[in-house]
Amino acid sequence: MTVFEVKYEDLAGRIGTLRTRSGTLETPAFFPVINVLKKDEISIDEIRNIGFKNFITNSYILYKNNYIKDDIHKELRSEEMIIMTDSGAYQILEYGEIGITNLQIVNYQLKIKPDIGVILDLPTGNINDYDNAKKTVYETLKRAEEASEIIVKNQDNNIIWVYPIQGGRYLDLVKTSAEGLSKFEHIYNMAALGSPTVLLEKYMYDTVIDMIYTAKSNIKRGIPFHLFGGGLPHIIPFAVALGVDSFDSASYIIYARDNRYITRTRVYKLEDLEYFPCSCPICSKYTPKDLLEMNEKERTKALAIHNLYTILEEFKATKQAIKEGRLFEYLQEKAYSHPAVYSAFKRLMKYKDYLEKFDPRIRGDPKGLFLFDGNSLHRPEIIRHSRFLERYIQKKDKISIYCYDKAISDTAYDFKEKIREKIADRNESDVFIAVPFFGLIPLEISDSYPLSQFEIPNEIDEDVIDDMKTKIISFLRRNNYQKVELINCEKLGLHIDSISTSS
């Protein structure tokens, strides 16, 4: 059955709808982890009031404590909520053997009827031994096969079953694990990457980016993709850019227990804050000093509620960036919040061709590009234009290159209109505009998006200027112009001598 539909795309990220037996969920989405046995921490009602219509809870804990005996929605009085159940894999990661089998936990989930269920995979975690990591991959594959027969027999339950991908930092194992889904696509309607939690705790964001890319690039694009344990706002938009559709985490409460205050750019110790940089209901009502004077139970709940508001805000900001076609710019903005986040951004740029492949060429309401520095050279629009120049067919023996200057015209559109006025009916040369980031823009296509819909800084970084010169030289070398004319190019340091070796 088709459970996932895409509404908007940007880079390899998307806004979509996940159809479940209890309703439709817009993605990217966050599933707060709730331990329903710990009612003194965060309740389902509080999750709902914050703005979540979904959560994840641990079926192993429910089974072990005989807490839910029938329909989980009815017993938790959450008929309108979308409920995902995890299988106990996290407990295996923490404690080792947990005394329950894969088939037992699958049958239990069939009994309590969550919207989304997970088989009992064997998580790789932060295993540094390749052979042991390999065992977790093949054991998880074995368990996926083992559970498939029961799942097929009970398809009337309309549970979305998740295929867990393991392998940890060993990307060849992640690839093997992801490829295994092809055998079960009619059974498992959702895929999930496991084992990033320990790496995220150690700020190894770039490694997690590698893992996500490897998993995503080895399954079909249309399959919704979940990231277990990905609950920090710092990494969320980068994971979304690669195509992660949903996340879960208990970070909001774990950090709260340790007096840690999550913002969209970093995590603070409560003791280090004089002011709250937030206007959620908690931060509007209390000061850091107020929270420090609370008893531990009250303080933990207050911090957890704030942390959830922050996570929800990050998802809204990420979706808005996708809707506007500005996800790349948003990632650039986020990248400078922490060196580990910048490392994640730089690692993401390693996969720029993958991002370009799925980035839409045409948008319903296109926005102008904001181009900043050398990192902007990796944007899909810039990559596509470079490929276009490689295919350009020379028409004349002469080339006239006008260098773009913001001092002459505020916008690229006005600048190229002035060029048209200058050349009037002259038709003796191929006319181009030299623009940082783009390299050369043929005048005849300069009206097309985004070639006249962009903003660049007044001062251009040297590496961007060097890139422009390289693109121009490469273009001239590929063609056979008998005469090269440069107009108004002194400010960009472009002159005949600098390109003469290309002719």
Curated annotation (Swiss-Prot):
Classification via Pfam families: TGT
Keywords of this entry: Glycosyltransferase, Metal-binding, Transferase, tRNA processing, Zinc
GO MF terms held by the record: pentosyltransferase activity; zinc ion binding
Catalyzed reactions: guanosine(15) in tRNA + 7-cyano-7-deazaguanine = 7-cyano-7-carbaguanosine(15) in tRNA + guanine
GO biological process, one term: tRNA wobble guanine modification
Pathway: tRNA modification; archaeosine-tRNA biosynthesis
Cofactor: Zn(2+)
Matches recorded under InterPro entries: ArchSynthase1/Queuine_TRR, TGT-like_sf, TgtA, tRNA_ribo_trans-like
Gene Ontology, cellular component aspect: cytoplasm
EC number: 2.4.2.48
Cofactor binding: number and manner: Binds 1 zinc ion per subunit.
Top-level class of the enzyme under EC nomenclature: transferase
Catalytic residues (positions): D86
Binding residues for substrate: D121
Cysteine disulfide links: none
Residues involved in Zn(2+) binding: C278, C280, C283
Functional description taken from the UniProt entry: Exchanges the guanine residue with 7-cyano-7-deazaguanine (preQ0) at position 15 in the dihydrouridine loop (D-loop) of archaeal tRNAs.
Sequence similarity: Belongs to the archaeosine tRNA-ribosyltransferase family.
Protein name (Swiss-Prot/TrEMBL): tRNA-guanine(15) transglycosylase
Name of the gene encoding the protein in the UniProt record: tgtA
